[in-house]
Amino acid sequence: MSDVLAELDKVLAQRKNAGDPESSYVAKLHHKGLNKILEKVGEECTETILAAKDAQHDSDTQHLIYETADLWFHSLVMLSHLGLSAEDVLNELARRFDLSGLEEKARRQS
């Protein structure tokens, strides 16, 4: 699974640094700046929430997967724009893996 994320990280970095905004969607987002990227993340988040609600009622899980992929993608573009990667998020998830959710929450509050 993480191989896909690693490859996507590479592509996002390439498009950020050398992509043509006229021919690359990712380069175009980077060119427009963080606010445009955040707008897309928010849009995809809303679409994912709506797809989850629909999936609960009509079992259309494929649409939910599609929208979640869009949300992840645009979140990765956001991370890339800020000099971060999927690996940074995976490392944080790994760090939390052995903690209970309540323990993690307590650590953040102290």
UniProtKB/Swiss-Prot annotation:
It is an enzyme of class 3 (hydrolase). GO terms for molecular function: ATP binding; phosphoribosyl-ATP diphosphatase activity. Its EC number is 3.6.1.31. It is found in: Cytoplasm. It catalyses: 1-(5-phospho-beta-D-ribosyl)-ATP + H2O = 1-(5-phospho-beta-D-ribosyl)-5'-AMP + diphosphate + H(+). Pathway: Amino-acid biosynthesis; L-histidine biosynthesis; L-histidine from 5-phospho-alpha-D-ribose 1-diphosphate: step 2/9. Its main location: cytoplasm. SUPFAM superfamilies: all-alpha NTP pyrophosphatases. GO terms for cellular component: cytoplasm. Keywords: Amino-acid biosynthesis, ATP-binding, Cytoplasm, Histidine biosynthesis, Hydrolase, Nucleotide-binding. GO terms for biological process: L-histidine biosynthetic process. Belongs to the PRA-PH family. This is Phosphoribosyl-ATP pyrophosphatase. It comes from Teredinibacter turnerae (strain ATCC 39867 / T7901). The gene is hisE.
